[in-house]
């Protein structure tokens, strides 16, 4: 009787025990299958990349891939990046080089290290500018302490630290500021009286520019205008003259790291859409509306000077011919 009770649990557990063992066998088979798939997924050694049946070496820094290798372990056909325009700074499998960064002077930046085929441009803040962020795409003017003492001078990575004024200095400034305000108003009124168009200024107003000057070819002045504008000024000018937003985005996409090229392309796009007739006058008026009167007056002065020189040269030639 005792042996029947001992054997009965084993008989009842038999099917369940068999199922568990079969399940365990299936798990082991699945693991083996995964291991086999993993081994066939990557047949190349570290540092190589697979192209069909071949494991190819990468291109070296300063190069881009032109054609994959044709033998396992072989090197692809690689061409050098354009010096001063493109770079790659590590081994890679790409068919493109990276575009060199542009240090925008309008944002207070200057070149620290020129771009090479193996190294990107390194920018830094110009003198009297600073940036205290880890990645800087815009530098700020250093603070001037004025009559205060300087505790720490401005560096390229930190702003000036000034010593706080005493109450006596504050009282002095309260006495000086009204006088400075009066002086500013006086100078401003004098300046307004000598705006272009005033006979004493020697510079005609945009409305009084003769037709032959108004229709001057602006191509030689486009880059000078762009050089003095910030990228935000150029975009504002383009939008004021109905340049489509899609065209502005296209220009930015074509030269993503080159703000100088973007400014030139924006102005050239406007010039092409406007046409030569009246373009000089439209450019000067547009710059004034964009609150860049300084650029407008400088461009107008250059155009007027070139016009006067052209007239003078023509007179000299005519006089020389009459003497002959």
From Swiss-Prot:
- Give the multimer and partner information: Component of the death-induced signaling complex (DISC) composed of cell surface receptor FAS/CD95, adapter protein FADD and the CASP8 protease; recruitment of CASP8 to the complex is required for processing of CASP8 into the p18 and p10 subunits. Interacts directly (via DED domain) with NOL3 (via CARD domain); inhibits death-inducing signaling complex (DISC) assembly by inhibiting the increase in FAS-FADD binding induced by FAS activation. Binds DAXX. Interacts with HIPK3. Part of a complex containing HIPK3 and FADD. Binds RIPK1 and FAIM2. Interacts with BABAM2 and FEM1B.
| Gene3D superfamilies, sorted | Death Domain, Fas, Tumor Necrosis Factor Receptor, subunit A, domain 2
Domain comment (free text) = Contains a death domain involved in the binding of FADD, and maybe to other cytosolic adapter proteins.
Protein role? Receptor for TNFSF6/FASLG. The adapter molecule FADD recruits caspase CASP8 to the activated receptor. The resulting death-inducing signaling complex (DISC) performs CASP8 proteolytic activation which initiates the subsequent cascade of caspases (aspartate-specific cysteine proteases) mediating apoptosis. FAS-mediated apoptosis may have a role in the induction of peripheral tolerance, in the antigen-stimulated suicide of mature T-cells, or both.
Q: Which BP terms in the Gene Ontology apply to this protein?
A: activation-induced cell death of T cells; apoptotic process; apoptotic signaling pathway; B cell mediated immunity; cellular response to amino acid starvation; cellular response to cobalt ion; cellular response to cytokine stimulus; cellular response to estrogen stimulus
**GO terms, molecular function:** calmodulin binding; identical protein binding; kinase binding; protease binding; protein-containing complex binding; transmembrane signaling receptor activity; tumor necrosis factor receptor activity
Matching entries from PROSITE patterns are given as:
DEATH_DOMAIN (PS50017), TNFR_NGFR_1 (PS00652), TNFR_NGFR_2 (PS50050)
Q: Which domain of life is it from?
A: Eukaryota
Q: Does the keyword Disulfide bond apply?
A: yes
Query: What organism, scientifically named, is this protein from?
Result: Rattus norvegicus (Rat)
Q: How does it sit in the membrane?
A: Single-pass type I membrane protein
Record's protein name? Tumor necrosis factor receptor superfamily member 6
Residues that bear Phosphoserine: 214
Entry GO CC:
apical dendrite; apical plasma membrane; CD95 death-inducing signaling complex; cell surface; death-inducing signaling complex; external side of plasma membrane; extracellular region; extracellular space
Write the record's keywords in alphabetical order, separated by commas. Apoptosis, Calmodulin-binding, Cell membrane, Disulfide bond, Glycoprotein, Lipoprotein, Membrane, Palmitate, Phosphoprotein, Receptor, Repeat, Signal, Transmembrane, Transmembrane helix
Q: Which gene encodes it?
A: Fas
Q: Which residues form the Death domain?
A: 219-303
Q: Does the keyword Kinase apply?
A: no
- Tell me where it resides: Cell membrane; Membrane raft
The segments annotated as topological domain Extracellular are 22-171
Q: Where are the transmembrane segments?
A: 172-188
* Sites where a glycan is attached: 43, 114, 132
Q: Where is this region: Interaction with HIPK3?
A: 201-306
PTM comment: the record says:
Palmitoylated. Palmitoylation by ZDHHC7 prevents the lysosomal degradation of FAS regulating its expression at the plasma membrane.
